[in-house]
């Protein structure tokens, strides 16, 4: 059984995106602190936040603080998605397609794969996803990992990233084993 993983180029791209996401998260933390004038010391945080609120916050403080708060909460979810993409492995087996990444292991039976849908038709690096008949995230025992995986991928889809080595071979094997039709050719005649 062959396991398909990200190519070196795909890993570099994921690493660049990961560094960018961490930089955005650091900027959001710094901006949130400076906008509200609070202290991140755990012993002084609530007191400094309370003092800032009691002094009154203007719109010029509230709007950027809320935007930074959204980034502070959402960026770790993006980081998880990038890390899960970084270590993703797709293994076709006789039972179905096994997906493994960062402690997540899910087996998608061939009969559960309804379609392979093109999400991004970029000529150089197209992105496809498997459309599934149901939710198979229940196979993930850890509830935190199950939540993070569902946030990253959804419950009824599984992306097949553009940077996967021998990606077309994986797509052909999935279509053959799942009994799916080949997509219409997009080449000009």
Question: What feature does the model see in each segment?
Answer:
Residues 1-63, 183-189:
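N-terminal membrane-targeting/pre-transmembrane regions
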Residues 2-6, 108, 155-162:
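Generic detection of short hydrophobic beta-strand segments and adjacent strand-loop junctions
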Residues 11-23, 108-121:
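Generic detector of contiguous secondary-structure segments
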Residues 23, 59-79:
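Canonical hydrophobic alpha-helical transmembrane segment
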Residues 29-40, 119-121, 132-141:
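Short regulatory "switch" loops immediately downstream of catalytic or recognition motifs
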Residues 122-189:
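A membrane-cytosol interface segment of integral membrane proteins
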């Amino acid at each position: 059984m062959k396991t398909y993983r990200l190519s070196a180029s795909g890993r570099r791209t994921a690493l660049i995106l990961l560094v960018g996401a961490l930089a955005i998260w650091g900027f959001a933390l710094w901006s949130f602190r400076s906008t509200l004038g609070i202290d991140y010391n755990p012993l002084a945080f609530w007191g400094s936040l309370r003092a800032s609120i009691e002094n009154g916050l203007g719109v010029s403080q509230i709007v950027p603080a809320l935007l930074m708060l959204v980034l502070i909460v959402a960026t770790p979810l993006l980081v998880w998605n990038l890390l899960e993409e970084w270590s993703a492995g797709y293994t076709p087996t006789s039972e179905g397609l096994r997906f493994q990444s960062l402690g997540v292991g899910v087996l998608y039976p061939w009969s559960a794969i309804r379609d392979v849908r093109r999400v991004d038709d970029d000529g150089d690096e197209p992105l496809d996803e498997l459309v599934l008949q149901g939710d198979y995230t229940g196979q993930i025992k850890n509830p935190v990992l199950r939540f993070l995986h569902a946030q990253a991928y959804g419950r009824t889809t599984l992306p097949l990233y553009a940077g996967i080595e021998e990606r077309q071979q994986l797509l052909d094997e999935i279509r053959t084993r799942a009994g799916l039709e080949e997509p219409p050719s997009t080449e000009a005649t």
